[in-house]
């Protein structure tokens, strides 16, 4: 994985899972993530909970959208996220609950590896559209 990766999810189990599968990632508590983004610190990739992202102040949320890779792990339906957010080529969605295949595809996408998305995985993992 190229560059700095941050993982911040409201669920400790999700943070722990990503910490184990992406050992080079830095795991942040939600409050710490907000503070760092407010200070203008930006990683190359961010894994964040969908509700957590929507609760960020607008200015901070806009900074997150400028990242090269933004993986949103969410239990919200895609309709619960702004269409402009979901359409961004630098944004991918990992729907909770997720299976191992979806998680592996999301991690490969984070790493910048082209991911072949199977038709049944298209809804849970939405990556760059070409």
What residue spans do the PLM features occupy?
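CheY-like receiver
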Residues: 115-130
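Short, hydrophobic alpha-helical segments
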Residues: 107-115
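C-terminal output helix
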Residues: 98-107
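Structural motif
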Residues: 6-11, 31, 47-52, 73-76, ...
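Acidic, metal-coordinating helix/loop segments flanking the phosphotransfer/catalytic sites
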Residues: 28-45, 53
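Alpha4 helix (beta4-alpha4-beta5 surface) of REC/receiver domains from two-component response regulators
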Residues: 76-93
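Short amphipathic alpha-helix used as the core "switch/output" element in two-component signaling
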Residues: 54-67
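Two-component/phosphorelay signaling modules centered on CheY-like receiver
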Residues: 10-31
């Amino acid at each position: 994985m190229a560059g700095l990766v941050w993982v911040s999810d409201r669920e400790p189990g999700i943070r722990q899972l990503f910490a184990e599968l992406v050992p080079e990632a830095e795991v942040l508590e939600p409050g710490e993530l907000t503070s760092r983004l407010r200070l203008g610190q930006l990683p190359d990739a961010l894994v964040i909970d969908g509700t957590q992202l929507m609760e960020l102040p607008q200015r901070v949320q806009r900074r997150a959208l400028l990242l090269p890779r933004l993986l949103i792990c969410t239990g919200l339906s895609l309709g619960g996220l702004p269409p402009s957010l979901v359409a961004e080529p630098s944004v991918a969605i990992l729907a909770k609950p997720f299976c191992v295949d979806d998680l592996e595809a999301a991690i490969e996408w984070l790493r910048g590896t082209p991911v072949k998305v199977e038709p049944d995985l298209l809804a849970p993992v939405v990556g760059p559209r070409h």
